[in-house]
C-alpha cells in the first residue's frame, strides 16, 4: 500500500525479498513496456527508479543468490549487476543473449559471474567449465543443480566456485529426458518437466540436508527434527552435525521439541555412529574431524536428557525418561524400573501405562527377570500382568518365592533361579548356620571358591583355634 505502481505491460519480474538487516526492506525489479521501448523499474524500500533501456531486446532479469541484488542481461550479451547500495557493475560479457542465465559467486569474495549452458551442453561460469553434457541447470542460494544426459541430477555447493576444496558431488537418478524447471529451496523441492510435458516435484536429499544443516546452524533443533521426520533423515544427524552445541542445549531442545513422542523417537534412533562420516558426509570431508568418545555417544545424550527431563517435569516426560534408560549401551533396565516403582506407590494408573510402554520397548520376559533380580514381587507381578505370561505359571511361583524365609534365603532362591550363582552364594552364607552345609555344597557345585572365601572371611567358625 502506498507503493508506486509500475506500468502494466510487464516483461520480466525479479523480487529479491528483503534487504539484509533491520528494517527489512523489500526490493523489487520489473521490466516493462513503455510504448515501443523497454523500461527498468526498481524499488528498494522508499527509493524508486525508472529508466528507459537502449534497444528492442530481448532483455532478462536474473536474481543473485544470497543478495538483494539483481542482474540485467541484454540482447548484446552484456550483464550488468544492480544493487540497492552500489552503482551498476558490468560483469564479463557473453557473446550473445542467453535465455538460461544465472548469477553465481566468483573467485573473489563479493564478486559475481554469469553462468550459462552452451549449445553443446557445457555449463560455464565466465570462462570456467563447471560441467559437461548438462541438459538444464538452476541454482539456489547455496546449491548449483544440473541434469545430465546420463539422467542424473547433480548437486554441488556454490562455495566450490569461490574456493577450491575437494568437494564431492551428490547426485540422484531422474526420469529419462527430465529438465529442470525451477528449484524451491524453502520447500526443499526440485520441479522437473518430463518429456511428455508433465511437471513432477521431487525432494532431493542434498536440498533436504542443506535445509536441515541450516536449521542446526541456527540452533533450530525443533524445526530440524520436523524436517528430518518428514523426509526420513536419520535423527542422529541432529547431534552429529555439532555434538558440542547439541549437548550444551538439551533443555532448549526439550523446549523446542516438547512433544514426548518426538523426543522418544529421537532417543530411540540413537546409536554409537557418526552419520556425518557414513550416511551424510559434508561437501568438504576434510572439515570434519572424527567424533571423540564415539563409543559413549548414546550414554552421554541419554544422561543429558535424563537430567533435563527430571529437572523440568518428570511426570510429563515419564515415557521419555524410560526410553532414555533402556536406550543406554548397555541398557539400564533396573533404573527404568525404579522410576516405574516410584509411581506404583503414588499413581497406580500411571504406573500401569508406563509399564505397558516399557514392555513395548523391551522384551517382557527380560523385564520380568530384572524385576525378580530387584527382589520386588509387586513390580514383578505388575510386569507379568501386562505381559502375555500365563497367570497359572507366574502366580504360584511368586507366591512360593514370597513365602520363603528368612529374607537372605529368599533372595538366594531368587538369584539361583536367575542363574546369578555368585550373588546366590553370598545370600546363602548369610541365611544362618542351618544352611552352612548347603552353602558349601553349592560353592563346590558351581566352583565359587573365591566367592566363598569372601563370603566367610569374617566368620570365626571357619578359622582354626589358636
Q: What is each stretch, according to the model?
A:
Residues 1-466:
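Extended alpha-helical solenoid/arm regions of large eukaryotic scaffolding proteins
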Amino acid at each position: 500500500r502506498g507503493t508506486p505502481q509500475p506500468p502494466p505491460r510487464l516483461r520480466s519480474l525479479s523480487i529479491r525479498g528483503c534487504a539484509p538487516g533491520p528494517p527489512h526492506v523489500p526490493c523489487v525489479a520489473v521490466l516493462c513496456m513503455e510504448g515501443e521501448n523497454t523500461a527498468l523499474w526498481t524499488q528498494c524500500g522508499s527509493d524508486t527508479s525508472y529508466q528507459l533501456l537502449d534497444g528492442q531486446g530481448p532483455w532478462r532479469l536474473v536474481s543473485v543468490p544470497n543478495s538483494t541484488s539483481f542482474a540485467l542481461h541484454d540482447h548484446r550479451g552484456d550483464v550488468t549487476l544492480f544493487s540497492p547500495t552500489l552503482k551498476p557493475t558490468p560483469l564479463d560479457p557473453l557473446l550473445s543473449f542467453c535465455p538460461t542465465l544465472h548469477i553465481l559467486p566468483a573467485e573473489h569474495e563479493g564478486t559475481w559471474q554469469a553462468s550459462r549452458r552452451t549449445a553443446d551442453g557445457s555449463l560455464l561460469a565466465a570462462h570456467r567449465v563447471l560441467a559437461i553434457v548438462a541438459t538444464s541447470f538452476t541454482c539456489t542460494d547455496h546449491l548449483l543443480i544440473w541434469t545430465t544426459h546420463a539422467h542424473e541430477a547433480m548437486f554441488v555447493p556454490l562455495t566450490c566456485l569461490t574456493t577450491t576444496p575437494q568437494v564431492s558431488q551428490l547426485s540422484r537418478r531422474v526420469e529419462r529426458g527430465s529438465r529442470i524447471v525451477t528449484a524451491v529451496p524453502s520447500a526443499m523441492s526440485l520441479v522437473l518437466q518430463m518429456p511428455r510435458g508433465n511437471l513432477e516435484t521431487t525432494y532431493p536429499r542434498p536440498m533436504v540436508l542443506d535445509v536441515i544443516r541450516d536449521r542446526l546452524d541456527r540452533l533450530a533443533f525443533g524445526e530440524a527434527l520436523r524436517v528430518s521426520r518428514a523426509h526420513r533423515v536419520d535423527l542422529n544427524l541432529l547431534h552429529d552435525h555439532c555434538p558440542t552445541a547439541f549437548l550444551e542445549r538439551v533443555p532448549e531442545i526439550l523446549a523446542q521439541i516438547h512433544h514426548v513422542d518426538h523426543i522418544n523417537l529421537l532417543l530411540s534412533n540413537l546409536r554409537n555412529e557418526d552419520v556425518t562420516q557414513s550416511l551424510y558426509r559434508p561437501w568438504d570431508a576434510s572439515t570434519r574431524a572424527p567424533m571423540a568418545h564415539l563409543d559413549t555417544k548414546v550414554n552421554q545424550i541419554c544422561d543429558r536428557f535424563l537430567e533435563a527431563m527430571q529437572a523440568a517435569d518428570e511426570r510429563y516426560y515419564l515415557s521419555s525418561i524410560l526410553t532414555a534408560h533402556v536406550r543406554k549401551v548397555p541398557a539400564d533396565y533396573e533404573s527404568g524400573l525404579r522410576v516405574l516403582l516410584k509411581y506404583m506407590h503414588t499413581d497406580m494408573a500411571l504406573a500401569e501405562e508406563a509399564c505397558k510402554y516399557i514392555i513395548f520397548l523391551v522384551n517382557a520376559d527380560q523385564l520380568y527377570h530384572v524385576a525378580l533380580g530387584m527382589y520386588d514381587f509387586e513390580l514383578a507381578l505388575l510386569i507379568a500382568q501386562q505381559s502375555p505370561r500365563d497367570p497359572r505359571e507366574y502366580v504360584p511361583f511368586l507366591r512360593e518365592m514370597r513365602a520363603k524365609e528368612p529374607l537372605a534365603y529368599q533372595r538366594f532362591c531368587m538369584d539361583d533361579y536367575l542363574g546369578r550363582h555368585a550373588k546366590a552364594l553370598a545370600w546363602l552364607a548369610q541365611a544362618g548356620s542351618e544352611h552352612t552345609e548347603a552353602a558349601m555344597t553349592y560353592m563346590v557345585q558351581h566352583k565359587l571358591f573365591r566367592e566363598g572365601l569372601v563370603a566367610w572371611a569374617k566368620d570365626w567358625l571357619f578359622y582354626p583355634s589358636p
